[in-house]
Amino acid sequence: MDSSNCKVNAPLLSQRHRRMVTKDGHSTLQMDGAQRGLVYLRDAWGILMDMRWRWMMLVFSASFVVHWLVFAVLWYAVAEMNGDLEIDHDVPPENHTICVKHITSFTAAFSFSLETQLTIGYGTMFPSGDCPSAIALLAIQMLLGLMLEAFITGAFVAKIARPKNRAFSIRFTDLAVVAHKDGKPNLIFQVANTRPSPLTNVRVSAVLYQERENGELYQTSVDFHLDGISSEECPFFIFPLTYYHTISPSSPLATLLQHETPPHFELVVFLSAMQEGTGEICQRRTSYLPSEIMLHHRFAALMTRGSKGEYQVKMENFDKTVPEHPTPVVSKSPHRTDLDIHINGQSIDNFQIAETGLTE
């Protein structure tokens, strides 16, 4: 398929049609008019986990600063109510108990709040054991400070250890191809695990999203299989895997691709796998538009042998495709359906799709 012609003649690439799921798996859906408020804030932990790192750092820094400022105001209020701001702390009046030594200004109160929170040790400023209000406020600040530090530490650890980070090492091919396998046309894509640590229990599913004339989105399940593995799961994911969807007459893609000007659609692929070391489930997503489906192409070879006979993966060929000449379908007594496939308004050679049943 000539990419330059696609850019000129393809109505599906206009600004009116945008992705619902980006190539790296992020959703572009916008919730207009959604009622957030307190209901949204109830999931504070989930909000923090979904934040970008720069916003998370800003929120945590602001939390500490606000905590210090609030207790600085409280320490200043204790000194004000106790009459400690107007006296000489080095030579205090008789019968006067100073709650916190040398808190004579708000700056000093903020410094004392900082020392209390970080437990760096008191210097010239320290609370008096004879002032109950100071001891009570000290206990409250220490308790709330420990809770804040525990929450922030847990959030950092949880964000770093998320399975989502492991999913970033899973890579899909930028394009999907339609090529013949066993005499039948198949929609094919590849996925690679770019880290040496294997993944297990790999599952792949796909959903075809189509926009109807009334503006509603219609979802259709698209089944993919992996070579000759009969189960739905691939037990071991260390080298690149190739997934196939047979374009039979019952395939939702077969009906869609035979239109001269097909409506906009998006094929979203989901891959779930288990991390071998932790047992956590990670998921990776991508999507393919009609302009990203190449007919009569197949992927270049990836697996080679090294000098010592070991297997090697040539990742430089991961996104490469090579032209394929369509192979006629050979069957004893097939029911054939000729589909004139068009992508973005361009007529492509016919595919002969044969049903697997035999006539009597």
Swiss-Prot record:
Phosphorylation at Ser-287 by PKA increases ionic currents. Residues 106-122 dip into the membrane without crossing it. The keyword Signal does not apply. GO terms for cellular component: monoatomic ion channel complex; plasma membrane. One of its GO terms (biological process) is potassium ion transmembrane transport. It comes from the Eukaryota. A motif (Selectivity filter) lies at residues 119-124. Expressed in retina. Residues 1-50, 158-360 are cytoplasmic. The keyword Iron does not apply. The chain crosses the membrane at residues 51-77, 132-157. The modification Phosphoserine is found at residue 287. Keywords: Cell membrane, Ion channel, Ion transport, Membrane, Phosphoprotein, Potassium, Potassium transport, Transmembrane, Transmembrane helix, Transport, Voltage-gated channel. The record marks 149 as: Role in the control of polyamine-mediated channel gating and in the blocking by intracellular magnesium. Residues 78-105, 123-131 are extracellular. Inhibited by Ba(2+) and Cs(+), although sensitivity to those inhibitors is much lower than in other Kir channels. One of its GO terms (molecular function) is inward rectifier potassium channel activity. Belongs to the inward rectifier-type potassium channel (TC 1.A.2.1) family. KCNJ13 subfamily. Inward rectifier potassium channels are characterized by a greater tendency to allow potassium to flow into the cell rather than out of it. Their voltage dependence is regulated by the concentration of extracellular potassium; as external potassium is raised, the voltage range of the channel opening shifts to more positive voltages. The inward rectification is mainly due to the blockage of outward current by internal magnesium. Homotetramer. Interacts with RAB28; the interaction may facilitate cone outer segments phagocytosis. This is Inward rectifier potassium channel 13. The gene is Kcnj13.
